[in-house]
Amino acid sequence: MYRLRGWLGWLLTILIILTLVGILAAGGMYYAISSKLPDIRNLKQVELQEPMYVYSHDGLLMAIFGEIRRYPVQIKEVPEQLKQAFLATEDARFYEHSGIDYKGIARAIWLLATTNEKRVPGGSTITQQVARQFFLNSEYSYKRKLAEILLARKIESQLKKDEILELYLNKSFFGNRAYGIAAAAEFYYGKKLNELNLDEMASLAGIPKFPSSGNPITNPARARERRDLYVLQRMVDLNFITQDQANAAKAIPMHAKPHEPPVQVYAPYAAEMVRQEMIAKYGGAALNKGYHVTTTIDGTLQMAAETSVRNGLALYEHRHRWRGAEQHIEVDANADTATLAAHLSGISSQGGMFPVIVARTTPEGSAVVVRSDRSELTLPPAAARWTGTPLNKLLKRGDVVRVRPGEKWGEWTLEQLPSAQSTLVSLDANNGALRALVGGFSFTANKFNRATQARRQPGSSFKPFVYSAALEKGFNPASIVPDAPVIFRDRRGHTWSPQNDDGKFQGPMRIRDALVQSRNLVSVRLLDAIGVDFARNYITQFGFEENEIPPNLSMSLGTASLTPLSIARGYAVFANGGFRIDPWLIDEIHDREHKLIFKNTPKVACRSCTSANTNVTQSTSQLVDGFNFGAPTKTEPSKPVKNNNEPPQTIPSPDPNTPMAPRAIDERVVFQLVSMMRDVVLRGTATAARSLNRQDIAGKTGSTNEHRDAWFSGFGGPYVTTVWVGRDDFQSLGYREYGGKAALPIWIEYMRTALKDKPIARNVPPQGMTQTTLNGATEWVKNEDINHLQDHDFKLHEEESDEQTFDIF
C-alpha cells in the first residue's frame, strides 16, 4: 500500500509539473503570438482592392481595369434573405457567439489529432474567416489557428456584428476574379443584390467553400449539389425559409453565365492610354484602388470615329480585289449547325466584322452562314456585289469569312479583314482635349496605337507648316513662285530632282493656288527661299521637336516621321488663331469615396488675351539663303484698298484663373493660311468636303511615295481632326489611293457628326493687315510687307532652260 501511494504521489507530481509546463508553454505561445498580432483598428479604415473605372466626358463607361472584380457594398444594401443564406452556410450562430465556436474548435482539434487528415472542417466562424482573410495565410497549423482565435476575439471586441459581416461579404473570393458578393452577383447573374432570386442567393452562398472548382460556371453540377443539399436545406432547418420555398428554388436549373459590365463607349485605345498614364502617375497599384477616371472623350464623337474608320477601311477593301476566304475547314456533309459553329471557337470579332462559316450556297447566288452562337444568317446576292462575283461562285461549304451588319436592320454584307489600317484623332482646338481617338481597325487584333505611336511621313499635309514659315518671311498668298523643274546638288555631287505627283509643271503660279493644287515644286522652292534652318526653327512653334524635322529641302514634301496626334496638334494652331495647345486625355480623377483628387487645368487658346501673345517669331522681309529665280515681276501692287485697324472680333475671355496657351505664330499668318486651306476644300484636292455644307471647313490632303500613306488633316467649328490610312508593313495602298480618296471620306463622315449644330467658325482678318491687289488677286497682307511685295515675286528668265542646277549649300 505504501508503495502504491508512492507511485500515485510521483504520478500526481508529474501531472502537476506537466500541467504547469503546459500552462507555461501555452502562456508563452499566447504571449509570443498575441504580441505580434496586427492592429485590429485598421479594419475600420480598410481599403479593399477595387478596379479602376474609366469614363467618357459625358459619364459613359469606357473600360474597367484591375486584377479583380469588386464592388464594395454596405451591409444595409444586402437583402435579409441573402444574409441568411450565408449565415446558414457558414455560421448559423454568428449573432450569438463572441467570435469563437468552441464546440467546432474542439471537433477540429480532435480530428487533427486522431486522423491523418491535414485539413478538417469545423471551428471557423465568420469572424475567424475575416481574421484569416485580412491578416493570416491559409496554412493549416495549431499556431495559425491560435492566432486566428485571438484575432477573432479582438475583432469582436472592436467591431459590431454587422461590420464584421460586411467585411466578410466584401472580402470573400467567389471565383472568376470576383471578390465580394456584389461582384459575384453581377458576374454570375448580371444582377444587383436586390434583384437576386432565392436559388441565386443560395448558389452564391455555396461558392466561397470551393470558389475555383465549385462555382456555377466551372462546375455547375457540383454547385447545384451544394445549393440544393446543403445551403437551401440548412436555411429550412434554421427556419429562414419554408420547405416549399426550398423545393421551388431547387427546381430551377443552374443558369449562371459570365456577365461583364457593359462598355457604353468603345474607345479601347484611349482607355489603354489612360491606364498607362495612371500607372505612371500613381504606380501599379492605381489599378486596384478604385479610382474613377473621367476623360475628355465625347461618347457620341467616339462612336462616330469608330464607325467612320471601319466604314472607310471597308470601302478601301471594296475598291480592291476579294482575297478569298479567311480559312477553309473540311467539314462532314452531315455536320449540323452546332458542329459548324464549334469551328469558330477562338476566332474573335474584329472591328465589327463577325466570323461565320459557310453552311451552303444556293443556285440563286445567296449563302447560308453560321455564327459562333449557332445562329444562321442568309446572305443575299447583294451582300457580295462589291466583289463582282456571285456568292455561289465565291464561297463554298466550310469557308470561314467575315460579315458585318448592313445599313438596314437584319441586313448583312460580306467583308474581309482590311489589309490597311487607319487612325483618327480629333481635338478641341482651343484647349487640346481629345474628343475622339481611334488607334487602328481592331484593338483585339493589335493593340499598337497608331495615333500616338506610329511615325509616318505626312506628305503634303505637312505643307501648311512650310507655307506658314514663308508667309512669316514676307511671302503672301498672291506671291508668284514657278512650278518648274529644278535639280539640287549637294557638295558630294548627289542630285535631287523633286517632281509633282502628276509629272507636269504649270510654270509661275500664286502660292495660294500652289497649296490648293498641292504642287511639290513650289513647296520646295519656297523652303529653299526662306532657308531650311529658319523653317525648322519656325515649325517647332507648332509643337514639333526640331530633331523630328529633316534638315534638308525634302522637309517641304513631308518626309518627317510624325505621329497623327502631333499633326493634329500642329493643325490646332491654325484652327485656334495661332496658339500652341497640349493634347490631354484625363479630365478628373475621383477616389473610391468619389472625392475629387485631380482636376486638369489645360492651357487655353484665347484670341482676346494679350498676355498670351508671347514667343512669336519676329517678322522680317529679308530673304535668307535664297536663290535668284529670275527678274522680279513688272507687276506693281495696286493701291491698298483697306487697312484693317478695326478692333478684332469680340471673343469672350475665359476665367482669369485659366492658364493661357502660348502664342505660336502670328495671328495674321494664321488668317492667311486658314483662307488658303479653305480654298483647298472649295476648289482643290479636298472638294469632297464641300458636302458638309459649311464655310469653315479647311484642311490639306497628304500622300507619300508609292501611296504608302494617305492623310487628311483639317478643322471646322471647334474641332481639328487628322485621319491617316496606311499599312503597317509600309507597302503601297494601291493605285491612286491618295489622301483625298482613302482618308478624306473617313474625315467627312466623322465631321458630319462632330459638327452637327456647331456654329460656323469665323476667319476675320486681324489688326495689322491691309487688303491689296497683286498679280490679279486681292489678298490680305501684313502691313509691314506692303512695301516688299516684289521681293517675293519671281518668274523664270525666258532665256533659261527648263532645268537649272543649284548648289544647296
Swiss-Prot record:
Tell me one Pfam family matched here.
Answer: Transpeptidase
Q: What is this protein called?
A: Penicillin-binding protein 1A
Pathway where this protein functions: Cell wall biogenesis; peptidoglycan biosynthesis
Source organism per entry reads Xylella fastidiosa (strain 9a5c)
One cellular component GO annotation, for this chain's record?
outer membrane-bounded periplasmic space
Q: Which InterPro entries match?
A: Beta-lactam/transpept-like, Glyco_trans_51, Glycosyltr_51/Transpeptidase, Lysozyme-like_dom_sf, PBP_transglycosylase, PCB_OB, PCN-bd_Tpept
**EC number(s) on record?**
2.4.99.28, 3.4.16.4
Similarity section = In the N-terminal section; belongs to the glycosyltransferase 51 family. In the C-terminal section; belongs to the transpeptidase family.
BP GO terms, sorted: cell wall organization; peptidoglycan biosynthetic process; proteolysis; regulation of cell shape; response to antibiotic
- Give the residue range of the signal peptide: none
| Catalytic residues identified in the record | 90, 460
Q: What does this protein do?
A: Cell wall formation. Synthesis of cross-linked peptidoglycan from the lipid intermediates. The enzyme has a penicillin-insensitive transglycosylase N-terminal domain (formation of linear glycan strands) and a penicillin-sensitive transpeptidase C-terminal domain (cross-linking of the peptide subunits).
Region described as Transglycosylase: 52-221
| Regions of compositional bias (Pro residues) in chain numbering | 649-659
Q: Which domain of life is it from?
A: Bacteria
Disordered as annotated region, ranges: 624-661
Give the residue ranges for region: Transpeptidase.
411-749
Q: Which UniProt keywords apply?
A: Antibiotic resistance, Carboxypeptidase, Cell inner membrane, Cell membrane, Cell shape, Cell wall biogenesis/degradation, Glycosyltransferase, Hydrolase, Membrane, Multifunctional enzyme, Peptidoglycan synthesis, Protease, Signal-anchor, Transferase, Transmembrane, Transmembrane helix
**Does this UniProt record's set of keywords contain Cell inner membrane?**
yes
> Listed GO molecular functions?
penicillin binding; peptidoglycan glycosyltransferase activity; serine-type D-Ala-D-Ala carboxypeptidase activity
Task: Kindly report every residue range on the membrane side named Cytoplasmic.
Answer: 1-5
Q: Which residues cross the membrane?
A: 6-26
Q: Residues on the Periplasmic side?
A: 27-809
- Membrane topology listed for this record: Single-pass type II membrane protein
The protein's annotated catalytic reaction(s) are:
[GlcNAc-(1->4)-Mur2Ac(oyl-L-Ala-gamma-D-Glu-L-Lys-D-Ala-D-Ala)](n)-di-trans,octa-cis-undecaprenyl diphosphate + beta-D-GlcNAc-(1->4)-Mur2Ac(oyl-L-Ala-gamma-D-Glu-L-Lys-D-Ala-D-Ala)-di-trans,octa-cis-undecaprenyl diphosphate = [GlcNAc-(1->4)-Mur2Ac(oyl-L-Ala-gamma-D-Glu-L-Lys-D-Ala-D-Ala)](n+1)-di-trans,octa-cis-undecaprenyl diphosphate + di-trans,octa-cis-undecaprenyl diphosphate + H(+); Preferential cleavage: (Ac)2-L-Lys-D-Ala-|-D-Ala. Also transpeptidation of peptidyl-alanyl moieties that are N-acyl substituents of D-alanine
Subcellular localization is given as:
Cell inner membrane
